[in-house]
Amino acid sequence: MKLSEKWIRRETMLSPSVVFFYEKSEIPNSFGLETRRVDGTGVYAEIKGCGEGKTIILRADIDALPVEETNGCSFRNKNKGVMHACGHDAHTASLLLAAKILSKHRDEFKGTVKLCFQQAVEIGYGAMKFIKAGLVTGDRSFGIHLASNIPVGKVSATEGPNNASVDYFKITVKGRGAHVSTPEKGIDALFVASSIVV
């Protein structure tokens, strides 16, 4: 399949897939990149420059969300029950275009650029697959996210981490029983737990 700006924009927008079901949309390698599947649906590639240098990681999320798209736009997706509601199609298209440009100009930079098209971002699963495969070691790592509050044509950069993440944690609240006439001697675990939530 020939890679073009039109294909990137339309294919990623019109054919969204959720989490682990991205087998349908192929990330083409028509600009000389060998790609590797990561856990079935993620995609990894490397662009080598003209000599030894730093390793930079560029990452984009590729999943759609399980939300029905209800608009009547011409670019409405073809897959029922899912849509790129969080801009992941634009993230994917941006990384594909970066790959295309860097591939054409690899004789103008040194080092390696690693491309990570990450799956399962919304459930905190996909990144671990790239990490466990040893694919995200490097000197710097960059990712982007669209923001509707930033004017078109502008870019906002923040030092350090600035995106949300999926984190799992468990809290154990231990109570202590007491007689009903001396509640001050006990610990009401239900009250403590509800205070944490609120």
Residues of each region from the PLM?
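Acidic/His- and Gly-rich active-site-bordering loop/insert found
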Residues: M1-H84, A93-F109
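Histidine/acidic-residue-rich, glycine-tolerant segments that coordinate divalent metal ions
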Residues: L65-V67, C73-M83, A90, D107-V198
